Amino acid sequence: MVSFTTLLAGFVAVTGVLSAPTETVEVVDVEKRQTIGPGTGFNNGYYYSYWNDGHSGVTYTNGAGGSFSVNWANSGNFVGGKGWNPGSSSRVINFSGSYNPNGNSYLSVYGWSKNPLIEYYIVENFGTYNPSTGTTKLGEVTSDGSVYDIYRTQRVNQPSIIGTATFYQYWSVRRNHAPAARSRLRTTSNAWRNLGLTLGTLDYQIIAVEGYFSSGNANINVS
């Protein structure tokens, strides 16, 4: 995550890993709270996705409803979170909780569309690395009083939800970090469309915590 290329390779790889929950961390109410290995699926009414690059030091836990937690220490690259599948361009996503990164990390709305194949991010908070570094700003949008800067990048022959492909990535990066916020997908998607950045049919859409060789903890609730 020192660069877009390194970061996004970790993000994209989420889509290629499938496994089932492996172990509960509580004897009581195990259906509502589970520590899991890498994988995707549904938990307590929400879609989840969790991937890591094989390094130890990351614990991802699905909680009740839309809640999840991540604890990481001297980890490699990972990304995990909860949301919906399919996504919606008109959804209003509320999230709250605590997010305490020490180093490179992001808290974002993350998802994909097909036809066209697009990978997109609405970055609400980040640690020491701003994902807009080294890119050209296309515009900005204001949502609920916060300003987001808009960028587009391209990935060539990289993993995606349909296999190896070449595709664009859309980015909206919030200027003021938010530990809790409301993300209005319609506002963002309209701003992207006005800049010629169109989305296709939406695939999964989650609030994701990502880290790259860093430490920290997060307890997030999505609704």
Swiss-Prot record:
All residue ranges annotated as the GH11 domain in the record: 34-223
Record key words, sorted: Carbohydrate metabolism, Glycoprotein, Glycosidase, Hydrolase, Polysaccharide degradation, Secreted, Signal, Xylan degradation
Lineage of origin: Eukaryota, Fungi, Dikarya, Ascomycota, Pezizomycotina
GO molecular function: endo-1,4-beta-xylanase activity
Record-linked Gene3D superfamilies: 2.60.120.180
Main location as per UniProt: secreted
Leader sequence residues: 1-19
A biological process from GO: xylan catabolic process
Active site: E119, E210
Protein name: Ethylene-inducing xylanase
Compartment(s): Secreted
Glycosylation sites: N94
Pathway: Glycan degradation; xylan degradation
Record's function text: Endo-1,4-beta-xylanase involved in the hydrolysis of xylan, a major structural heterogeneous polysaccharide found in plant biomass representing the second most abundant polysaccharide in the biosphere, after cellulose. Acts as an elicitor of plant defense responses in hosts such as tobacco (Nicotiana tabacum) or tomato (Solanum lycopersicum). Induces the production of ethylene and leads alterations in membrane function with rapid efflux of potassium, uptake of calcium, alkalization of the medium, increased leakage of cellular components and necrosis in plant hosts.
Record family assignment: Belongs to the glycosyl hydrolase 11 (cellulase G) family.
Reaction(s) the record says it catalyses: Endohydrolysis of (1->4)-beta-D-xylosidic linkages in xylans
Pfam families: Glyco_hydro_11
Quaternary state and interactors: Interactc with tomato LeEix2 receptor to trigger its internalization.
EC number(s) reported in the record: 3.2.1.8
InterPro entries in UniProt: ConA-like_dom_sf, GH11/12, GH11_AS_1, GH11_AS_2, GH11_dom, Glyco_hydro_11
